[in-house]
Amino acid sequence: MQAEERKTTMDQNETQWDKLLKIRTTGRDDSHSDQYRYPYEPTPYCVLERLANSGMIGKQNTVLDYGTGKGRVCFYLSYQTRCRSVGIEYDERIFSGAMENREMAVSGARTCFVKADAGEYPVPKEVDWCYFFNPFSIEILQKVLARIYESFYEHPREKILVFEII
């Protein structure tokens, strides 16, 4: 398959999943990115399909998506695995997109979104999966990991961190 054909197939997959989930998450947005917070760029559905099909996430789990953007990870995983999901986003405009999506999304009832600075956000005790898709710099990541460790020590449990770095 040629590169152009692969891109067209991938774009169709992105659009089809958004339509099925009743959300709008495609595209990239660099308008509020800087050296610490990276552009809005949703995780490709092919990556989420592999994660969901791993069988490691189920309805007993709660996923925390750092830099959730418009909520694609939360909506997809909640739909496919029946898990609960929490999305953290600092950008007001993009956060508004996640909230609009939640109103229409088929899995909206199992998702929630918080507008917050990821480095300051206290990790809820029920969270056992943390997902990162290239959301921010190492400086912010260090603060986030400190919060995750705090939560783990306060409420010991198995926790899984998933990093997708581009």
Regions found by a protein language model. Give the residues of each.
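S-adenosyl-L-methionine
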Residues: 1-58
